From Swiss-Prot:
This is PTS system mannitol-specific EIICB component. Residues 367-387 have a biased composition (Low complexity). Its EC number is 2.7.1.197. The phosphoenolpyruvate-dependent sugar phosphotransferase system (sugar PTS), a major carbohydrate active transport system, catalyzes the phosphorylation of incoming sugar substrates concomitantly with their translocation across the cell membrane. The enzyme II CmtAB PTS system is involved in D-mannitol transport. One of its GO terms (biological process) is phosphoenolpyruvate-dependent sugar phosphotransferase system. Residues 394-406 have a biased composition (Acidic residues). Keywords: Cell membrane, Kinase, Membrane, Phosphoprotein, Phosphotransferase system, Sugar transport, Transferase, Transmembrane, Transmembrane helix, Transport. Pfam families: PTS_EIIC, PTS_IIB. It is found in: Cell membrane. The EIIC type-2 domain forms the PTS system translocation channel and contains the specific substrate-binding site. It comes from Staphylococcus haemolyticus (strain JCSC1435). The active site is at C431. Residues 53-56, 164-172, 301-320 are extracellular. It comes from the Bacteria.
């Protein structure tokens, strides 16, 4: 019974992670639009850095129309590619026009995937039944009719529901703010970050509500709750001073990556090594939120990534010191509590490598920065098992891992010399989101090709679920290769342990030159 309950809890956690990951896939590609809107609002509105009545008119339409439509398009495209995105964006206009005074981000996050899924089902039904020669007619009219129906439904049905939901959430936040209880949110948010459940909270609640508040009040504290780098740097500073061995040695580099790069996951293994440090990050987070609430601080747009540099750039006029104070006090409290815990408690039984593997298992995939903490191959097995669980497989861990290994062996994913590269002119790096680690890997390989004089091979990056059917050569981290194979089974697949440091790149480079010289 206890084992069944544990499995159910793990399954629920995976579902929340998957949900958060999907929300993140809609929001993160559009962060640039949020930042552009934030700059326009911060600089040109009446109380901005350089007020300009003419240019300030851009802010309203951008947050009312542009950003919700971009989110809806991204959500629809995730489900049914370009066609799903276009129909989803069109249908979302119904919700936007029905509630023009409320930035309809939440409505776009619902309407986008929903309409994309409906378009996919309509196409699956119609395509086998479409007479030859009528394909364009059926395709265009089916998309147009579905967009028409869903736009009307969005206007009449979804908009009132969204208005009610936004009202309830806003009242809840206002209640916490009024009673000065907003800092208690950190009790949920800070542990959720380390358990990788934060995306569902951050992108599902804070971003829509924060955007709504920023549009009406000019800024929102909700953008500063989860992204504050203070609690994390406090933990790492404690390790720099009181840590030992590998944890101490790696904490310096981790601190730079976390504080200036905004990659918070780099400090998660340090907390997992000593679970009592959850107390430190919670108290640090609460201190930061309490400071911002007391000073009335907030950002005009999402501070993403959670880097101190981004915080400096996004700080509203006249509130730079408030921003610094919130980060400093959060870091100070986190550091003091962590230092006391490390000084007066026993050394952890698990080392940093074990904690990193635990973090990757919790995340359900290989971390793009974990190699900075451990050896290149650390945690691969644990992450592979977790990835299979996240995909909904109900087999036991051993059999799941064996199946994955068999699939990789069948494709010779670790034997670069086993493939023919004579017809390869396009290499694709693929990761979960298609933005972070794969982009860095692709950039590095492009530089290697340039130095080697290989100019006729294009190197790009994308998300695994957006790999094109005609992909020729796909490079993924080992824990994600099985998903890539299932997505494009006819491509050559190469597994690496770390996108930024793999000996297989040199092997690939030599094989490409050799095979293409023969051709």
């Amino acid at each position: 019974m206890a084992q069944t309950e544990t499995q159910e809890k793990k399954g629920l956690g995976r579902k929340v992670q998957a949900f958060g990951s999907f929300l993140s896939s809609m929001i993160m590609p559009n962060i640039g639009a949020f930042i552009a809107w934030g700059f326009i609002a911060a600089i040109f509105i009446d109380n901005g850095w350089y007020p300009n009545k003419e240019l300030s008119q851009l802010a309203g339409p951008m947050i009312t129309y542009l950003i919700p439509l971009l989110i809806a398009f991204s959500g629809g495209r995730l489900i049914h590619d370009l066609r799903g995105g276009i129909v989803a964006a069109t249908a979302t206009m119904g919700v936007i026009v029905a509630l023009p005074d409320t930035p309809m981000l939440l409505g776009a996050m619902i309407m986008g995937p929903l309409v994309g899924w409906l378009m996919k089902k309509v196409d699956q039904f119609l395509q086998p039944r479409t007479p030859q020669g009528f394909e364009m007619l059926f395709n265009n009219f089916s998309a147009g009719i579905l967009a028409f129906i869903m736009t009307i439904l969005g206007f009449k049905l979804l908009a009132p529901i969204m208005q009610f939901i936004m009202h309830i959430l806003s009242v809840a936040v206002e209640f916490l703010v009024h009673l000065h209880l907003l800092p208690i949110v950190s009790i949920i948010v800070e542990p959720a970050k380390i358990l990788f459940l934060n995306n569902a909270i951050n992108h599902g609640v804070f971003t829509p509500l924060g955007t709504d508040q920023a549009a009406s009040a000019g800024q929102s504290i909700l953008f500063a709750i989860e992204s504050n780098p203070g609690p994390g740097i406090g933990i790492l500073l404690a390790y720099m001073i009181f840590g030992k061995g590998t944890a101490k040695a790696t904490s310096y580099g981790a601190g730079i990556i976390h504080f200036f790069g905004g990659i918070h996951e780099i400090y998660f293994p340090y907390v997992l090594m000593r679970p009592l440090l959850f107390i430190a990050v919670i108290l640090g987070g609460m201190t930061g939120v309490a400071t911002y609430q007391a000073t009335g601080f907030g950002f005009k747009s999402p501070a993403s990534p959670g880097s101190f540099i981004v915080y400096c750039l996004n700080a509203p006029k006249g509130e730079f010191l408030h921003m610094v104070l919130g980060v400093f006090l959060a870091a100070l409290v986190s550091f003091v509590v962590a230092a006391l815990i490390m000084k007066f408690t026993k050394e952890p039984k698990q080392d940093l490598e074990a904690a990193t593997a635990k973090m990757e298992s919790t995340k359900g995939k290989k971390s793009s920065v974990s190699s900075k903490l451990t050896g290149a191959t650390t945690g691969t097995g644990a992450a592979g098992v977790a990835a299979n669980k996240a995909n909904g497989e109900d087999q036991n861990e051993a059999s799941s891992e064996d199946e994955e290994e068999d699939l990789l062996d069948n494709y010779n994913t670790e034997d670069v010399d086993a493939h023919d590269y004579s017809n390869v002119d396009h290499v694709i790096f693929a990761c979960d989101a298609g933005m972070g680690s794969s982009a860095m890997g692709a950039s590095m390989l492009r530089n290697k090709f340039k130095k080697a004089g290989i100019s006729d091979v294009n190197v790009t990056n994308t998300a695994i679920n957006q790999l094109p059917n005609n992909a020729q050569l796909v490079i993924t981290q080992k824990t994600l290769t099985d998903r890539a194979i299932k997505q494009v089974p006819n491509a050559i697949h190469i597994s690496v342990d770390n996108f930024l440091n793999s000996p297989r790149y040199e092997e690939l480079l030599n094989n490409l030159k050799k095979d293409q010289d023969k051709a």
